[in-house]
């Protein structure tokens, strides 16, 4: 898992530790590793050394937001590392408007994926 720098850490804002993320999903902490391997979820090492998951990756019902897996797959297939993908998801994009992660929480994942796919060209 990637380590991120303080500016990227600040972009995200709210974080969940791995035990908190597992609790939010209602699964044992060990199952998170499979979600990371399957690219359904992304965790990074924060500047303070803790492993964490952005809280924005979860909806109000305790599930991973719709479309995150597909977007992560597209970004990683484009050659992004975990830290770069995280930074892209939380950086404002005037064409959306807002950040890609905000658009995904508003069910505009198709728009986000189109922009992510365009990065490959």
Language-model segments: residues:
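Non-transmembrane "mature" sequence context
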Residues: 1-121
